[in-house]
Amino acid sequence: MQGRLSAWLVKHGLVHRSLGFDYQGIETLQIKPEDWHSIAVILYVYGYNYLRSQCAYDVSPGGLLASVYHLTRIECGIYQPEEVCIKIFVPRNNPRIPSIFWVWKSADFQERESYDMLGISYDNHPRLKRILMPESWIGWPLRKDYITPNFYEIQDAH
């Protein structure tokens, strides 16, 4: 079933794949990484002016990684905002997605956390570096194929 935004994107020739609706009735779309930045700008201009959240997850061990964006269009009505969920899948051997920091500034720490935990690189992000783990940390802790080190170095807080 195609939602309102999906129909609008089709009408304007923008490539995407409808993934249906979630349990709350929020339309979910899949966008290719190479199309994401231009579609993000279009969505912002269309009225999706609030990035509610961005997260990432490992789809399956050795499989794809996903970056998920929850966008809200508040101008439609403050009591019934229109929401959409965007999913972008990337291969784990070269997980690169254009950063949308320059569209929604609130993506800053969220994209950095996804980089830190899963190793997804957000191209053109101004400060893409680890945010939770030390810079010297090896690997991506939330990947399903991550091997946990069998020791942890206790560091002095001083």
Swiss-Prot record:
E.C. designation(s): 7.1.1.-
Known partners and oligomeric status: NDH is composed of at least 16 different subunits, 5 of which are encoded in the nucleus.
Alphabetical GO biological process terms: photosynthesis, light reaction
UniProt-recorded Gene Ontology molecular function terms: NADH dehydrogenase (ubiquinone) activity; quinone binding
PROSITE patterns: COMPLEX1_30K
UniProt record similarity statement: Belongs to the complex I 30 kDa subunit family.
GO (cellular component) term, any one: chloroplast thylakoid membrane
Membrane topology: Peripheral membrane protein
Subcellular location field: Plastid, Chloroplast thylakoid membrane
Gene behind the chain: ndhJ
Catalysed conversion reaction: a plastoquinone + NADH + (n+1) H(+)(in) = a plastoquinol + NAD(+) + n H(+)(out); a plastoquinone + NADPH + (n+1) H(+)(in) = a plastoquinol + NADP(+) + n H(+)(out)
Upper lineage: Eukaryota, Viridiplantae, Streptophyta, Embryophyta, Tracheophyta
Major localisation: plastid
InterPro entries assigned to the protein according to its UniProt record, in alphabetical order: NADH_DH_suC, NADH_quin_OxRdtase_su_C/D-like, NADH_UbQ_OxRdtase_30kDa_su, NADH_UbQ_OxRdtase_CS
Organism from which the protein derives: Lotus japonicus
Broad class of enzyme this protein falls into: translocase
Protein name: NAD(P)H-quinone oxidoreductase subunit J, chloroplastic
Keywords: Chloroplast, Membrane, NAD, NADP, Plastid, Plastoquinone, Quinone, Thylakoid, Translocase, Transport
Matching SUPFAM superfamilies: Nqo5-like
Gene3D superfamilies: NADH:ubiquinone oxidoreductase, 30kDa subunit (3.30.460.80)
Function recorded in the entry: NDH shuttles electrons from NAD(P)H:plastoquinone, via FMN and iron-sulfur (Fe-S) centers, to quinones in the photosynthetic chain and possibly in a chloroplast respiratory chain. The immediate electron acceptor for the enzyme in this species is believed to be plastoquinone. Couples the redox reaction to proton translocation, and thus conserves the redox energy in a proton gradient.
